[in-house]
């Protein structure tokens, strides 16, 4: 995945807040990356309403 790409949230791996659950099935734009634990990288996604959060790569699908 690259910065600027459109992605769709296709699954949620962990229990998350209702605010994140509302993003399931939504499309957003990759804004950056976040180092998680030394071996995993999170993808920072921003949505139309300017809300941004990170997801695991396997939770997203490139559009």
Where do the model's predicted regions map?
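Basic/aromatic-rich interaction segments and small domains that mediate binding to polyanionic partners
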Residues: 2-63
């Amino acid at each position: 995945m690259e910065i600027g790409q459109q992605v769709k949230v296709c699954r949620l791996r962990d229990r998350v807040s209702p605010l994140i659950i509302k993003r399931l099935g939504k499309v957003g734009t990759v804004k950056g990356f976040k180092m998680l634990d030394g071996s995993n990288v999170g993808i920072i996604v921003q949505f139309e309403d300017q809300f941004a959060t990170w997801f695991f790569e396997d939770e997203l699908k490139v559009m």
